[in-house]
């Protein structure tokens, strides 16, 4: 529940920077991962785990792509 709280507030109040959006989505994925680990069957848990890894990798690709092509990542300062 704490990860859900942190991710929602970070997503609401720090939406201007890409890195904070990606971090809040990772916290949201972690909260769902912890919640669904007790509720889902083994196969659905495996699908959800694969989805969370793929979304993490795609988030990093988006951030690196923005820094490469646009020059300013607009995420640190």
Curated annotation (Swiss-Prot):
Predominant subcellular localization, coarse grouping: mitochondrion
EC number: 7.1.1.2
Subcellular location as annotated: Mitochondrion membrane
Membrane topology according to the record: Multi-pass membrane protein
Membrane spanning residue stretches: 18-38, 44-64
Keyword terms of this UniProt record: Electron transport, Membrane, Mitochondrion, NAD, Respiratory chain, Translocase, Transmembrane, Transmembrane helix, Transport, Ubiquinone
GO MF annotation terms: NADH dehydrogenase (ubiquinone) activity
Recorded superkingdom: Eukaryota
GO cellular component: mitochondrial membrane
Catalytic function, reaction form: a ubiquinone + NADH + 5 H(+)(in) = a ubiquinol + NAD(+) + 4 H(+)(out)
Function: Core subunit of the mitochondrial membrane respiratory chain NADH dehydrogenase (Complex I) that is believed to belong to the minimal assembly required for catalysis. Complex I functions in the transfer of electrons from NADH to the respiratory chain. The immediate electron acceptor for the enzyme is believed to be ubiquinone.
Homology family: Belongs to the complex I subunit 4L family.
Name under which the protein is recorded: NADH-ubiquinone oxidoreductase chain 4L
Protein species of origin: Caenorhabditis briggsae
Lineage: Eukaryota, Metazoa, Ecdysozoa, Nematoda, Chromadorea
Annotated gene: nd4l
